[in-house]
Amino acid sequence: MDCMYDAELVDVVKNTSNESILPILEQKINLLVSSGETKCYRTLKRILYDFVTRKHLDGIMYILDSELLTDNVIRKIDRYCILLSCKFGFVELLEYLDEIGVDILVEKIYLELIFEDSFKYSRYDHDDEYYDDHFFKSSIHYAVKYGHMNIIEYLSCKKTNADGLLSACSLKNIQLVKYFLDQQNYDDNTIYHGLRSACWNGDLEMVKYFMQYIPEDKRNNVFILDHVCEEGYFDILVYLIEQKWKIDVEFAIKQTVMGGRLEMLKYLIAQYPDSKYSVVKLIETISYCGKDETLEYLLSFEDSKLKKFIKSNKFSKLLEVVCERGYLKVFKILFHLNENVDLREAFSNACQNGHLDIVQYIISNKKEFTDKNFLENDQEHITYLTRITFAKGHLDILKCLDEIGISRSYISEYAASLVIGNGFRSKKTLECVQWLFEDEKYHKYSQAIAVKAFRYDTVSVIKYLVSVGLDIKPITNIALDYICINNNMDCLKYLIENGTDITINDNRAIKLAAQEDNIDIVKCLVENGADIRTDDDYVMKICTLRNHKVLIRYLMSLDIKEPSNESIESIEPINTIKNPNKSEKNWIKHHCESIYYTKLMDRP
Protein backbone atom coordinates (compact mmCIF):
# COMPACT_ATOMS: atom_id res chain seq x y z
CA MET A 1 0.00 0.00 0.00
CA ASP A 2 1.30 3.45 -0.93
CA CYS A 3 1.66 6.05 1.79
CA MET A 4 -0.03 9.36 1.08
CA TYR A 5 3.31 11.20 1.29
CA ASP A 6 6.95 10.38 0.54
CA ALA A 7 8.06 9.21 3.97
CA GLU A 8 11.55 8.35 2.74
CA LEU A 9 12.19 11.87 1.44
CA VAL A 10 10.80 13.41 4.63
CA ASP A 11 13.19 11.30 6.73
CA VAL A 12 16.17 12.18 4.50
CA VAL A 13 15.44 15.90 4.81
CA LYS A 14 14.94 15.64 8.53
CA ASN A 15 18.33 13.97 9.00
CA THR A 16 20.33 16.18 6.62
CA SER A 17 22.12 19.38 7.65
CA ASN A 18 21.09 22.78 6.29
CA GLU A 19 24.30 23.01 4.26
CA SER A 20 23.69 19.72 2.42
CA ILE A 21 19.94 19.80 1.89
CA LEU A 22 19.54 21.88 -1.29
CA PRO A 23 21.26 19.39 -3.64
CA ILE A 24 18.94 16.67 -2.35
CA LEU A 25 15.87 18.80 -3.04
CA GLU A 26 17.11 19.63 -6.53
CA GLN A 27 17.56 15.94 -7.21
CA LYS A 28 14.20 14.81 -5.78
CA ILE A 29 11.78 17.62 -6.65
CA ASN A 30 11.00 16.41 -10.20
CA LEU A 31 10.11 12.91 -9.03
CA LEU A 32 7.99 14.31 -6.20
CA VAL A 33 6.00 16.57 -8.53
CA SER A 34 5.37 13.68 -10.90
CA SER A 35 3.76 11.68 -8.06
CA GLY A 36 0.69 13.94 -8.17
CA GLU A 37 -0.55 17.04 -6.36
CA THR A 38 -1.81 15.31 -3.23
CA LYS A 39 1.33 13.34 -2.47
CA CYS A 40 3.53 16.28 -3.46
CA TYR A 41 1.69 18.71 -1.21
CA ARG A 42 1.55 16.39 1.78
CA THR A 43 5.25 15.67 1.49
CA LEU A 44 6.17 19.34 1.19
CA LYS A 45 4.05 20.14 4.24
CA ARG A 46 6.23 17.93 6.36
CA ILE A 47 9.45 19.23 4.83
CA LEU A 48 8.39 22.84 5.35
CA TYR A 49 7.46 22.12 8.94
CA ASP A 50 10.96 20.75 9.52
CA PHE A 51 12.59 23.73 7.79
CA VAL A 52 10.62 26.26 9.84
CA THR A 53 11.47 24.59 13.14
CA ARG A 54 15.17 24.96 12.31
CA LYS A 55 14.72 28.40 10.69
CA HIS A 56 16.16 27.24 7.35
CA LEU A 57 14.88 30.06 5.16
CA ASP A 58 16.96 29.13 2.09
CA GLY A 59 15.34 25.71 1.89
CA ILE A 60 11.87 27.23 2.19
CA MET A 61 12.66 29.82 -0.48
CA TYR A 62 13.84 27.08 -2.84
CA ILE A 63 10.49 25.30 -2.51
CA LEU A 64 8.41 28.48 -2.79
CA ASP A 65 10.32 29.62 -5.88
CA SER A 66 10.13 26.28 -7.68
CA GLU A 67 8.57 26.59 -11.14
CA LEU A 68 7.71 22.89 -11.17
CA LEU A 69 4.88 23.10 -8.63
CA THR A 70 1.28 23.52 -9.75
CA ASP A 71 -0.69 26.64 -8.84
CA ASN A 72 -2.92 24.61 -6.53
CA VAL A 73 0.04 23.24 -4.54
CA ILE A 74 1.70 26.68 -4.40
CA ARG A 75 -1.49 28.29 -3.06
CA LYS A 76 -1.77 25.73 -0.28
CA ILE A 77 1.92 25.93 0.58
CA ASP A 78 1.81 29.73 0.76
CA ARG A 79 -0.95 29.66 3.35
CA TYR A 80 0.69 26.87 5.25
CA CYS A 81 3.89 28.91 5.48
CA ILE A 82 1.89 31.85 6.86
CA LEU A 83 0.56 29.61 9.59
CA LEU A 84 3.99 28.18 10.42
CA SER A 85 5.57 31.62 10.59
CA CYS A 86 2.86 32.65 13.07
CA LYS A 87 3.25 29.48 15.10
CA PHE A 88 7.04 29.64 15.41
CA GLY A 89 7.55 33.42 15.30
CA PHE A 90 9.53 33.18 12.04
CA VAL A 91 9.11 36.79 10.94
CA GLU A 92 11.77 36.50 8.20
CA LEU A 93 9.57 33.94 6.45
CA LEU A 94 6.54 36.21 6.77
CA GLU A 95 8.53 39.10 5.32
CA TYR A 96 9.63 36.96 2.37
CA LEU A 97 6.07 35.84 1.70
CA ASP A 98 4.99 39.48 1.74
CA GLU A 99 7.84 40.37 -0.61
CA ILE A 100 6.83 37.80 -3.26
CA GLY A 101 3.22 39.00 -3.22
CA VAL A 102 1.52 36.47 -0.94
CA ASP A 103 -1.52 37.87 0.92
CA ILE A 104 -0.22 37.47 4.48
CA LEU A 105 -3.38 39.04 5.91
CA VAL A 106 -5.44 36.13 4.65
CA GLU A 107 -8.68 35.65 6.57
CA LYS A 108 -9.00 31.89 6.06
CA ILE A 109 -6.21 29.48 6.84
CA TYR A 110 -7.37 25.88 7.01
CA LEU A 111 -7.09 24.90 10.66
CA GLU A 112 -6.43 21.21 10.00
CA LEU A 113 -3.14 22.13 8.37
CA ILE A 114 -1.67 22.17 11.87
CA PHE A 115 -0.19 18.81 12.68
CA GLU A 116 1.80 17.30 15.52
CA ASP A 117 5.54 17.87 15.80
CA SER A 118 6.04 14.09 16.06
CA PHE A 119 5.18 13.48 12.38
CA LYS A 120 2.97 10.54 13.36
CA TYR A 121 0.51 10.23 10.51
CA SER A 122 -1.87 7.46 9.59
CA ARG A 123 -1.08 5.94 6.22
CA TYR A 124 -4.78 6.47 5.53
CA ASP A 125 -4.73 10.14 6.60
CA HIS A 126 -7.09 12.55 4.88
CA ASP A 127 -5.81 15.88 6.18
CA ASP A 128 -6.90 17.99 3.22
CA GLU A 129 -10.34 16.72 2.32
CA TYR A 130 -12.67 18.91 4.35
CA TYR A 131 -13.16 22.62 3.78
CA ASP A 132 -15.93 23.79 6.07
CA ASP A 133 -15.61 27.49 6.97
CA HIS A 134 -16.08 26.50 10.60
CA PHE A 135 -12.48 25.28 10.57
CA PHE A 136 -10.89 28.46 9.15
CA LYS A 137 -9.08 31.20 11.08
CA SER A 138 -7.13 34.26 9.96
CA SER A 139 -3.37 34.86 10.05
CA ILE A 140 -3.70 37.51 12.79
CA HIS A 141 -5.75 35.07 14.87
CA TYR A 142 -2.86 32.59 14.85
CA ALA A 143 -0.35 35.36 15.51
CA VAL A 144 -2.31 36.32 18.63
CA LYS A 145 -2.85 32.70 19.63
CA TYR A 146 0.87 31.90 19.61
CA GLY A 147 1.81 35.31 21.05
CA HIS A 148 4.91 36.17 19.00
CA MET A 149 5.04 39.98 19.18
CA ASN A 150 7.33 40.30 16.15
CA ILE A 151 4.68 38.58 14.01
CA ILE A 152 1.82 40.56 15.57
CA GLU A 153 3.62 43.86 15.01
CA TYR A 154 4.45 43.01 11.40
CA LEU A 155 0.86 42.03 10.55
CA SER A 156 -0.61 44.99 12.47
CA CYS A 157 1.45 47.55 10.59
CA LYS A 158 -0.20 46.47 7.33
CA LYS A 159 -3.71 47.60 8.20
CA THR A 160 -6.14 48.07 11.07
CA ASN A 161 -7.03 44.50 11.95
CA ALA A 162 -10.13 44.02 14.09
CA ASP A 163 -9.64 40.26 14.13
CA GLY A 164 -6.39 40.67 16.06
CA LEU A 165 -8.03 42.74 18.79
CA LEU A 166 -11.01 40.41 19.10
CA SER A 167 -8.78 37.34 19.12
CA ALA A 168 -6.78 38.86 21.97
CA CYS A 169 -10.05 39.44 23.83
CA SER A 170 -11.26 35.88 23.36
CA LEU A 171 -7.87 34.55 24.50
CA LYS A 172 -8.04 36.82 27.60
CA ASN A 173 -4.69 38.46 26.79
CA ILE A 174 -4.93 41.92 28.36
CA GLN A 175 -1.43 42.94 27.25
CA LEU A 176 -2.24 42.32 23.60
CA VAL A 177 -5.59 44.09 23.98
CA LYS A 178 -3.77 47.15 25.27
CA TYR A 179 -1.26 46.89 22.43
CA PHE A 180 -3.94 46.81 19.72
CA LEU A 181 -6.02 49.60 21.27
CA ASP A 182 -2.98 51.84 21.73
CA GLN A 183 -1.58 51.22 18.23
CA GLN A 184 -4.69 51.36 16.05
CA ASN A 185 -8.06 53.09 15.78
CA TYR A 186 -11.20 50.94 15.69
CA ASP A 187 -14.81 51.71 14.86
CA ASP A 188 -17.53 51.67 17.53
CA ASN A 189 -18.80 48.25 16.49
CA THR A 190 -15.38 46.63 17.03
CA ILE A 191 -14.99 48.35 20.41
CA TYR A 192 -18.43 47.10 21.48
CA HIS A 193 -17.52 43.57 20.39
CA GLY A 194 -14.29 43.74 22.37
CA LEU A 195 -16.03 45.07 25.47
CA ARG A 196 -18.68 42.39 25.25
CA SER A 197 -16.00 39.71 24.96
CA ALA A 198 -14.29 41.12 28.05
CA CYS A 199 -17.61 41.05 29.90
CA TRP A 200 -18.27 37.47 28.82
CA ASN A 201 -14.84 36.48 30.14
CA GLY A 202 -15.43 38.26 33.44
CA ASP A 203 -12.26 40.33 32.99
CA LEU A 204 -12.81 43.60 34.88
CA GLU A 205 -9.37 45.01 34.01
CA MET A 206 -10.06 44.54 30.30
CA VAL A 207 -13.54 46.06 30.68
CA LYS A 208 -12.04 49.16 32.30
CA TYR A 209 -9.48 49.52 29.52
CA PHE A 210 -12.16 49.36 26.82
CA MET A 211 -14.40 51.82 28.67
CA GLN A 212 -12.05 54.77 28.07
CA TYR A 213 -12.66 54.36 24.31
CA ILE A 214 -16.46 54.60 24.64
CA PRO A 215 -17.99 58.09 25.08
CA GLU A 216 -20.58 58.38 27.84
CA ASP A 217 -23.38 59.15 25.37
CA LYS A 218 -22.74 55.82 23.61
CA ARG A 219 -22.82 53.60 26.68
CA ASN A 220 -26.19 52.14 25.84
CA ASN A 221 -25.79 48.63 24.41
CA VAL A 222 -28.16 46.60 26.61
CA PHE A 223 -26.81 43.24 25.44
CA ILE A 224 -23.47 43.94 27.12
CA LEU A 225 -25.14 42.90 30.38
CA ASP A 226 -26.72 39.57 29.47
CA HIS A 227 -23.74 37.33 30.21
CA VAL A 228 -22.52 39.54 33.06
CA CYS A 229 -25.78 39.04 34.93
CA GLU A 230 -26.25 35.38 34.06
CA GLU A 231 -22.69 34.39 35.02
CA GLY A 232 -22.63 36.52 38.17
CA TYR A 233 -19.82 38.96 37.39
CA PHE A 234 -20.91 41.27 40.20
CA ASP A 235 -17.86 43.57 40.06
CA ILE A 236 -18.37 44.22 36.34
CA LEU A 237 -22.09 44.93 36.83
CA VAL A 238 -21.35 47.47 39.57
CA TYR A 239 -18.62 49.08 37.45
CA LEU A 240 -20.87 49.41 34.39
CA ILE A 241 -23.61 51.05 36.44
CA GLU A 242 -21.06 53.41 38.04
CA GLN A 243 -19.93 54.37 34.54
CA LYS A 244 -23.54 55.31 33.75
CA TRP A 245 -24.06 52.45 31.33
CA LYS A 246 -27.68 52.48 30.23
CA ILE A 247 -29.28 49.17 31.12
CA ASP A 248 -32.63 47.51 30.61
CA VAL A 249 -33.43 46.76 34.26
CA GLU A 250 -36.12 44.18 33.52
CA PHE A 251 -33.80 42.36 31.13
CA ALA A 252 -30.90 42.49 33.61
CA ILE A 253 -33.08 41.13 36.42
CA LYS A 254 -34.30 38.30 34.21
CA GLN A 255 -30.73 37.33 33.24
CA THR A 256 -29.68 37.48 36.89
CA VAL A 257 -32.57 35.24 37.87
CA MET A 258 -31.68 32.75 35.12
CA GLY A 259 -28.19 32.48 36.57
CA GLY A 260 -29.49 32.22 40.13
CA ARG A 261 -27.38 35.20 41.18
CA LEU A 262 -29.16 36.16 44.39
CA GLU A 263 -26.81 38.92 45.56
CA MET A 264 -26.86 40.57 42.14
CA LEU A 265 -30.65 40.36 42.10
CA LYS A 266 -30.86 42.08 45.48
CA TYR A 267 -28.44 44.76 44.26
CA LEU A 268 -30.49 45.50 41.12
CA ILE A 269 -33.77 45.67 43.00
CA ALA A 270 -32.21 48.01 45.57
CA GLN A 271 -30.56 50.12 42.88
CA TYR A 272 -33.76 50.43 40.83
CA PRO A 273 -36.64 50.25 43.34
CA ASP A 274 -39.15 51.74 40.90
CA SER A 275 -38.48 49.26 38.11
CA LYS A 276 -41.38 47.13 36.91
CA TYR A 277 -41.08 43.38 36.54
CA SER A 278 -43.40 40.41 36.88
CA VAL A 279 -42.72 38.34 39.99
CA VAL A 280 -44.74 35.47 38.52
CA LYS A 281 -42.64 35.37 35.35
CA LEU A 282 -39.46 35.54 37.40
CA ILE A 283 -40.70 32.64 39.54
CA GLU A 284 -41.27 30.60 36.40
CA THR A 285 -37.82 31.47 35.08
CA ILE A 286 -35.98 30.69 38.32
CA SER A 287 -37.89 27.43 38.77
CA TYR A 288 -36.86 26.26 35.31
CA CYS A 289 -33.25 26.94 36.32
CA GLY A 290 -33.49 25.16 39.68
CA LYS A 291 -32.27 28.02 41.87
CA ASP A 292 -34.13 27.46 45.17
CA GLU A 293 -32.58 30.28 47.25
CA THR A 294 -33.44 32.87 44.64
CA LEU A 295 -36.96 31.41 44.39
CA GLU A 296 -37.52 31.82 48.13
CA TYR A 297 -36.34 35.42 47.90
CA LEU A 298 -38.75 36.20 45.06
CA LEU A 299 -41.65 34.67 46.97
CA SER A 300 -41.04 37.16 49.78
CA PHE A 301 -42.47 39.87 47.50
CA GLU A 302 -46.21 40.33 47.39
CA ASP A 303 -47.80 39.93 44.00
CA SER A 304 -51.53 39.99 43.41
CA LYS A 305 -51.19 37.62 40.45
CA LEU A 306 -49.40 34.89 42.40
CA LYS A 307 -52.54 33.41 44.02
CA LYS A 308 -54.21 33.10 40.65
CA PHE A 309 -51.07 31.62 39.10
CA ILE A 310 -50.69 28.75 41.59
CA LYS A 311 -54.21 27.55 40.75
CA SER A 312 -53.70 27.66 36.99
CA ASN A 313 -52.62 25.07 34.45
CA LYS A 314 -49.39 27.01 34.01
CA PHE A 315 -48.45 26.17 37.58
CA SER A 316 -49.08 22.47 36.95
CA LYS A 317 -46.94 22.66 33.81
CA LEU A 318 -44.22 24.39 35.80
CA LEU A 319 -44.17 21.53 38.31
CA GLU A 320 -43.96 19.03 35.45
CA VAL A 321 -40.81 20.71 34.12
CA VAL A 322 -39.28 20.97 37.59
CA CYS A 323 -39.87 17.23 38.14
CA GLU A 324 -38.47 16.41 34.72
CA ARG A 325 -35.27 18.29 35.56
CA GLY A 326 -35.02 16.90 39.09
CA TYR A 327 -35.05 20.10 41.16
CA LEU A 328 -36.25 18.68 44.50
CA LYS A 329 -35.76 21.83 46.60
CA VAL A 330 -37.59 23.95 44.04
CA PHE A 331 -40.37 21.37 43.85
CA LYS A 332 -40.86 21.42 47.63
CA ILE A 333 -41.13 25.22 47.67
CA LEU A 334 -43.67 25.28 44.83
CA PHE A 335 -45.66 22.33 46.16
CA HIS A 336 -46.27 24.09 49.47
CA LEU A 337 -47.84 26.99 47.57
CA ASN A 338 -50.65 24.66 46.44
CA GLU A 339 -50.71 21.14 47.85
CA ASN A 340 -53.93 20.34 46.00
CA VAL A 341 -52.35 20.60 42.57
CA ASP A 342 -52.69 17.60 40.23
CA LEU A 343 -49.28 15.90 40.21
CA ARG A 344 -49.91 12.91 37.96
CA GLU A 345 -47.90 14.24 35.02
CA ALA A 346 -45.25 15.67 37.32
CA PHE A 347 -44.97 12.29 39.06
CA SER A 348 -44.64 10.56 35.70
CA ASN A 349 -41.89 12.97 34.64
CA ALA A 350 -39.96 12.34 37.84
CA CYS A 351 -40.23 8.57 37.35
CA GLN A 352 -39.16 8.42 33.72
CA ASN A 353 -36.25 10.78 34.30
CA GLY A 354 -34.91 8.86 37.28
CA HIS A 355 -35.42 11.38 40.08
CA LEU A 356 -35.99 9.03 43.00
CA ASP A 357 -35.93 11.76 45.65
CA ILE A 358 -38.87 13.58 44.04
CA VAL A 359 -40.77 10.32 43.51
CA GLN A 360 -40.40 9.42 47.18
CA TYR A 361 -41.38 12.93 48.28
CA ILE A 362 -44.55 12.90 46.18
CA ILE A 363 -45.55 9.45 47.44
CA SER A 364 -45.05 10.61 51.03
CA ASN A 365 -47.00 13.85 50.62
CA LYS A 366 -49.72 12.99 48.10
CA LYS A 367 -51.69 10.08 49.48
CA GLU A 368 -53.66 9.69 46.26
CA PHE A 369 -50.74 7.75 44.76
CA THR A 370 -51.18 5.02 47.35
CA ASP A 371 -54.97 5.15 47.29
CA LYS A 372 -56.91 2.16 45.92
CA ASN A 373 -58.95 4.41 43.65
CA PHE A 374 -55.78 5.53 41.87
CA LEU A 375 -54.45 2.00 41.52
CA GLU A 376 -57.77 0.63 40.28
CA ASN A 377 -59.18 3.46 38.19
CA ASP A 378 -56.15 4.99 36.50
CA GLN A 379 -54.80 1.94 34.73
CA GLU A 380 -53.77 3.74 31.54
CA HIS A 381 -51.60 6.21 33.43
CA ILE A 382 -50.06 3.47 35.58
CA THR A 383 -49.36 1.30 32.53
CA TYR A 384 -47.56 4.11 30.74
CA LEU A 385 -45.72 5.14 33.91
CA THR A 386 -44.38 1.63 34.52
CA ARG A 387 -43.41 0.95 30.93
CA ILE A 388 -41.63 4.24 30.33
CA THR A 389 -39.76 3.96 33.64
CA PHE A 390 -38.57 0.46 32.76
CA ALA A 391 -37.63 1.50 29.22
CA LYS A 392 -35.44 4.27 30.68
CA GLY A 393 -33.77 1.77 33.03
CA HIS A 394 -34.64 3.36 36.38
CA LEU A 395 -34.55 0.26 38.57
CA ASP A 396 -34.63 2.05 41.92
CA ILE A 397 -37.85 3.80 40.93
CA LEU A 398 -39.38 0.54 39.67
CA LYS A 399 -38.73 -0.98 43.08
CA CYS A 400 -40.24 2.08 44.75
CA LEU A 401 -43.38 1.77 42.59
CA ASP A 402 -43.56 -1.93 43.39
CA GLU A 403 -43.79 -1.06 47.09
CA ILE A 404 -46.98 0.95 46.52
CA GLY A 405 -48.62 -1.74 44.40
CA ILE A 406 -47.50 -0.80 40.88
CA SER A 407 -45.84 -4.05 39.83
CA ARG A 408 -43.88 -5.33 36.84
CA SER A 409 -47.06 -6.91 35.48
CA TYR A 410 -47.67 -3.76 33.39
CA ILE A 411 -44.44 -4.22 31.41
CA SER A 412 -45.00 -5.51 27.87
CA GLU A 413 -42.50 -7.33 25.66
CA TYR A 414 -42.07 -4.20 23.57
CA ALA A 415 -41.42 -2.03 26.64
CA ALA A 416 -39.00 -4.62 28.00
CA SER A 417 -36.94 -4.55 24.80
CA LEU A 418 -36.79 -0.75 24.84
CA VAL A 419 -34.51 -0.74 27.87
CA ILE A 420 -31.74 -1.81 25.48
CA GLY A 421 -30.64 1.43 23.86
CA ASN A 422 -32.73 3.71 26.08
CA GLY A 423 -31.51 2.69 29.52
CA PHE A 424 -27.88 3.69 28.96
CA ARG A 425 -28.08 6.82 31.13
CA SER A 426 -29.09 4.86 34.19
CA LYS A 427 -26.29 2.32 33.57
CA LYS A 428 -28.61 -0.38 34.92
CA THR A 429 -29.80 -2.04 31.74
CA LEU A 430 -28.66 -5.51 32.77
CA GLU A 431 -29.97 -5.09 36.32
CA CYS A 432 -33.40 -4.11 34.97
CA VAL A 433 -33.58 -7.24 32.81
CA GLN A 434 -32.48 -9.38 35.75
CA TRP A 435 -35.11 -7.78 37.99
CA LEU A 436 -37.84 -8.42 35.41
CA PHE A 437 -36.73 -12.03 34.96
CA GLU A 438 -36.99 -12.74 38.67
CA ASP A 439 -40.49 -13.77 37.63
CA GLU A 440 -40.06 -16.63 35.15
CA LYS A 441 -43.18 -15.76 33.19
CA TYR A 442 -41.22 -12.88 31.63
CA HIS A 443 -38.58 -15.23 30.19
CA LYS A 444 -40.76 -15.32 27.07
CA TYR A 445 -39.47 -11.80 26.34
CA SER A 446 -35.91 -13.12 25.90
CA GLN A 447 -35.73 -13.14 22.11
CA ALA A 448 -37.13 -9.63 21.65
CA ILE A 449 -34.69 -8.27 24.23
CA ALA A 450 -31.81 -10.21 22.68
CA VAL A 451 -32.47 -8.78 19.22
CA LYS A 452 -32.18 -5.28 20.65
CA ALA A 453 -29.05 -6.30 22.56
CA PHE A 454 -27.42 -7.47 19.33
CA ARG A 455 -28.40 -4.20 17.71
CA TYR A 456 -26.73 -2.11 20.44
CA ASP A 457 -23.81 -4.47 21.14
CA THR A 458 -24.97 -5.11 24.71
CA VAL A 459 -23.20 -8.43 25.11
CA SER A 460 -23.65 -8.57 28.90
CA VAL A 461 -27.42 -8.82 28.44
CA ILE A 462 -27.04 -11.51 25.78
CA LYS A 463 -24.85 -13.59 28.07
CA TYR A 464 -27.39 -13.29 30.87
CA LEU A 465 -30.30 -14.25 28.60
CA VAL A 466 -28.41 -17.32 27.41
CA SER A 467 -27.73 -18.26 31.04
CA VAL A 468 -31.48 -18.34 31.73
CA GLY A 469 -32.32 -20.42 28.68
CA LEU A 470 -32.29 -18.27 25.54
CA ASP A 471 -31.66 -20.16 22.28
CA ILE A 472 -29.82 -17.83 19.89
CA LYS A 473 -30.27 -19.97 16.78
CA PRO A 474 -33.73 -18.62 15.79
CA ILE A 475 -32.39 -15.05 15.79
CA THR A 476 -28.92 -15.66 14.32
CA ASN A 477 -29.80 -14.03 10.98
CA ILE A 478 -31.00 -10.78 12.45
CA ALA A 479 -28.20 -10.82 15.04
CA LEU A 480 -25.52 -11.03 12.35
CA ASP A 481 -27.19 -8.29 10.32
CA TYR A 482 -27.17 -5.89 13.25
CA ILE A 483 -23.57 -6.80 14.08
CA CYS A 484 -22.40 -6.10 10.53
CA ILE A 485 -24.44 -2.93 10.08
CA ASN A 486 -23.54 -1.38 13.44
CA ASN A 487 -19.94 -2.62 13.78
CA ASN A 488 -20.72 -4.57 16.96
CA MET A 489 -17.46 -6.40 17.59
CA ASP A 490 -18.22 -7.65 21.12
CA CYS A 491 -21.35 -9.45 19.99
CA LEU A 492 -19.58 -10.92 16.97
CA LYS A 493 -16.82 -12.34 19.15
CA TYR A 494 -19.43 -13.81 21.49
CA LEU A 495 -21.21 -15.59 18.62
CA ILE A 496 -17.93 -16.96 17.29
CA GLU A 497 -16.88 -18.19 20.74
CA ASN A 498 -20.18 -20.04 21.00
CA GLY A 499 -19.81 -21.77 17.64
CA THR A 500 -22.27 -19.76 15.56
CA ASP A 501 -21.98 -20.32 11.81
CA ILE A 502 -20.99 -16.90 10.46
CA THR A 503 -21.17 -18.06 6.83
CA ILE A 504 -24.92 -18.71 6.73
CA ASN A 505 -27.05 -17.26 3.93
CA ASP A 506 -24.26 -17.45 1.36
CA ASN A 507 -21.76 -15.50 3.50
CA ARG A 508 -24.24 -12.63 3.88
CA ALA A 509 -22.42 -11.32 6.97
CA ILE A 510 -19.10 -10.52 5.32
CA LYS A 511 -20.82 -9.03 2.29
CA LEU A 512 -22.97 -6.80 4.48
CA ALA A 513 -20.03 -5.73 6.67
CA ALA A 514 -18.08 -4.76 3.55
CA GLN A 515 -21.05 -2.90 2.13
CA GLU A 516 -21.30 -0.89 5.38
CA ASP A 517 -17.52 -0.19 5.38
CA ASN A 518 -16.86 -1.91 8.72
CA ILE A 519 -13.30 -3.12 8.20
CA ASP A 520 -12.81 -4.55 11.70
CA ILE A 521 -15.86 -6.77 11.30
CA VAL A 522 -14.65 -7.88 7.87
CA LYS A 523 -11.22 -8.79 9.24
CA CYS A 524 -12.71 -10.71 12.16
CA LEU A 525 -15.02 -12.65 9.86
CA VAL A 526 -12.13 -13.52 7.52
CA GLU A 527 -10.00 -14.69 10.44
CA ASN A 528 -12.81 -16.98 11.54
CA GLY A 529 -13.62 -18.69 8.29
CA ALA A 530 -15.77 -16.36 6.20
CA ASP A 531 -15.06 -16.46 2.47
CA ILE A 532 -13.68 -13.07 1.41
CA ARG A 533 -14.04 -14.06 -2.26
CA THR A 534 -17.60 -15.30 -2.02
CA ASP A 535 -20.05 -14.70 -4.83
CA ASP A 536 -17.42 -13.87 -7.47
CA ASP A 537 -15.53 -11.31 -5.34
CA TYR A 538 -18.71 -9.53 -4.22
CA VAL A 539 -16.83 -7.94 -1.30
CA MET A 540 -14.28 -6.21 -3.52
CA LYS A 541 -16.93 -5.17 -6.01
CA ILE A 542 -19.23 -3.56 -3.44
CA CYS A 543 -16.25 -1.78 -1.84
CA THR A 544 -15.22 -0.44 -5.24
CA LEU A 545 -18.77 0.59 -6.06
CA ARG A 546 -19.06 2.53 -2.79
CA ASN A 547 -15.46 3.79 -2.80
CA HIS A 548 -14.49 2.26 0.56
CA LYS A 549 -10.80 3.13 0.20
CA VAL A 550 -9.47 1.58 3.40
CA LEU A 551 -11.23 -1.70 2.78
CA ILE A 552 -10.04 -1.76 -0.82
CA ARG A 553 -6.45 -1.43 0.36
CA TYR A 554 -6.99 -4.25 2.84
CA LEU A 555 -8.44 -6.49 0.14
CA MET A 556 -5.57 -5.68 -2.21
CA SER A 557 -3.16 -6.75 0.53
CA LEU A 558 -4.89 -10.16 0.29
CA ASP A 559 -4.02 -10.26 -3.44
CA ILE A 560 -7.57 -9.48 -4.55
CA LYS A 561 -7.46 -7.29 -7.63
CA GLU A 562 -9.69 -4.29 -8.19
CA PRO A 563 -12.55 -5.19 -10.54
CA SER A 564 -13.18 -3.58 -13.90
CA ASN A 565 -15.91 -0.97 -14.27
CA GLU A 566 -17.93 -3.40 -16.37
CA SER A 567 -17.91 -6.08 -13.67
CA ILE A 568 -19.43 -3.81 -11.02
CA GLU A 569 -22.19 -2.32 -13.15
CA SER A 570 -24.56 -5.18 -12.38
CA ILE A 571 -23.66 -5.53 -8.69
CA GLU A 572 -26.74 -5.39 -6.44
CA PRO A 573 -26.27 -4.03 -2.90
CA ILE A 574 -27.76 -6.07 -0.08
CA ASN A 575 -31.10 -4.67 1.02
CA THR A 576 -31.05 -3.87 4.73
CA ILE A 577 -34.65 -3.94 5.88
CA LYS A 578 -36.30 -3.33 9.21
CA ASN A 579 -36.42 -7.00 10.01
CA PRO A 580 -33.73 -8.92 8.12
CA ASN A 581 -35.41 -12.24 8.89
CA LYS A 582 -38.95 -11.90 7.54
CA SER A 583 -40.08 -15.24 8.99
CA GLU A 584 -39.65 -13.77 12.47
CA LYS A 585 -41.45 -10.51 11.70
CA ASN A 586 -44.50 -11.26 13.83
CA TRP A 587 -42.65 -11.34 17.12
CA ILE A 588 -39.58 -9.19 16.62
CA LYS A 589 -40.11 -5.46 16.79
CA HIS A 590 -37.69 -3.12 15.11
CA HIS A 591 -37.64 0.49 16.26
CA CYS A 592 -35.34 3.41 16.89
CA GLU A 593 -34.41 4.85 20.28
CA SER A 594 -37.39 7.22 20.26
CA ILE A 595 -40.25 6.15 22.48
CA TYR A 596 -43.73 6.96 21.22
CA TYR A 597 -46.75 6.88 23.51
CA THR A 598 -49.02 5.02 21.08
CA LYS A 599 -46.48 2.32 20.33
CA LEU A 600 -45.57 1.93 23.98
CA MET A 601 -49.21 1.47 24.95
CA ASP A 602 -50.45 -0.58 21.99
CA ARG A 603 -47.65 -2.98 21.16
CA PRO A 604 -47.69 -6.30 23.04
Swiss-Prot record:
PROSITE patterns assigned:
ANK_REP_REGION, ANK_REPEAT
Membrane-spanning parts? none
Fetch the SMART domains from UniProt: ANK
Where are the ANK-type repeats located?
Answer: 77-106, 135-164, 166-189, 190-219, 221-247, 248-277, 314-341, 342-371, 380-410, 445-474, 475-504, 505-534, 535-565
Species annotation:
Acanthamoeba polyphaga mimivirus
Q: Give the top-rank taxon of the lineage listed in the UniProt record for this protein.
A: Viruses
Q: Report keywords, A-Z.
A: ANK repeat, Repeat
Gene3D superfamilies per the record?
Answer: Ankyrin repeat-containing domain
One of its Pfam families is Ank_2
Name the UniProt record assigns to this protein: Putative ankyrin repeat protein L56
PANTHER family according to UniProt:
ANKYRIN REPEAT-CONTAINING PROTEIN
